[in-house]
């Protein structure tokens, strides 16, 4: 597919760096043409993308790909699936990471369950894991399995592990409870907080004991965050179980700077 005539409808930046001379009718027709040929157009657009460090402009291709990603879910659901699958397939080709990152971000807008496995592969790729995680969290359907698989592969990389823990916590994945509990004893503060957050998201009363035990060990910023996560946990529990959290806060927060936490806990008990 010769994509260039379609791209010519999209503006190039003026010398001062802003898009100018936008022909709305022309761009609308261009997007319609892309939607009418979603698979071929997606591949052709992906092939036009360049790494930002290389010479030449790909602004029109980026504009077209993003505009279509926004429009196609509304205009034609069947075409959306084909377009998303074609973009996802392009991730398997040899391309600069920053190009793949851009494509993944478009899938965040227009992708569905059909592309989660293609995106999930990048949860263990430094530099692309954040983009992949954000896309999967936007799609949701099928994302949990990708985060679980990535977590198993990222044991030696704290950042990648945190990325997957964050995804599983955000999705309130109950089956990941053992991983959240394991994270509570990690040497890294951020990892421990992700473990606490995960438990507060799942809100299983059976995990209150390890949650409160871990909370008691935290200091400084993590101690404050842990208390707030405790309150969130309590909001999802029965009155009886929630009271355990509030009593714990009252008993453990003795510093002047923690007075407000005690007041909140006492108010919740009454």
Ranges and model annotations:
Residues 1-17, 39-51, 74-92, 101, ...:
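Amphipathic alpha-helical scaffolding segments comprising HEAT/armadillo-like alpha-solenoid repeats
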Residues 20-60:
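N-terminal, post-signal-peptide region of Sec/Tat-exported proteins
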Residues 23, 53-57, 95-96, 124-128, ...:
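Short inter-helical turns and helix N-cap capping residues of alpha-solenoid HEAT/ARM repeat scaffolds
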Residues 23-27, 42, 57-62, 100, ...:
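Residue-level detector of extended alpha-helical repeat arrays and alpha-solenoid scaffolds
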Residues 27-31, 46, 62-66, 84, ...:
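Hydrophobic core positions within HEAT/HEAT-like alpha-solenoid repeats
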Residues 33-36, 63-71, 103-109, 135-138, ...:
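Core register positions within helices of long alpha-helical scaffolds
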Residues 86, 127-131, 159, 163, ...:
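Beta-propeller blade termini and top-face loops
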Residues 94-98, 105-110, 114, 123, ...:
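Internal alpha-solenoid helical repeat scaffolds
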């Amino acid at each position: 597919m010769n994509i260039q005539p379609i791209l010519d409808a999209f503006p190039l930046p003026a010398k001062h760096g802003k898009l100018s001379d936008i022909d709305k009718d022309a761009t609308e027709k261009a997007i319609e043409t892309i939607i009418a040929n979603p698979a071929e157009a997606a591949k052709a657009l992906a092939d036009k993308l360049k790494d930002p460090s290389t010479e030449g402009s790909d602004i029109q291709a980026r504009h077209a790909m993003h505009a279509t990603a926004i429009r196609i879910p509304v205009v034609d659901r069947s075409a959306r699936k084909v377009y998303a699958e074609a973009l996802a397939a392009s991730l398997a080709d040899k391309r600069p990471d920053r190009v793949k990152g851009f494509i993944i971000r478009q899938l965040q807008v227009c992708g569905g369950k059909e592309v989660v496995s293609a995106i999930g592969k990048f949860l263990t790729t430094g530099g692309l894991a954040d983009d992949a995680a954000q896309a999967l969290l936007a799609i949701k359907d099928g994302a949990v399995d990708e985060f679980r698989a990535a977590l198993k592969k990222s044991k030696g990389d704290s950042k990648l592990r945190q990325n997957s823990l964050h995804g599983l916590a955000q999705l309130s994945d109950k089956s990941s409870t053992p991983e959240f509990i394991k994270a509570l004893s990690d040497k890294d503060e951020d990892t421990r907080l992700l473990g606490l957050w995960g438990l507060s998201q799942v809100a299983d009363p059976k995990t209150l004991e390890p949650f409160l035990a871990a909370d008691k060990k935290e200091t400084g910023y993590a101690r404050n965050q842990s208390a707030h996560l405790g309150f969130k946990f309590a909001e999802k529990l029965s009155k009886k179980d929630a009271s355990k959290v509030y009593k714990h806060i009252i008993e453990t927060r003795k510093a002047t700077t923690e007075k407000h936490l005690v007041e909140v806990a006492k108010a919740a008990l009454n």
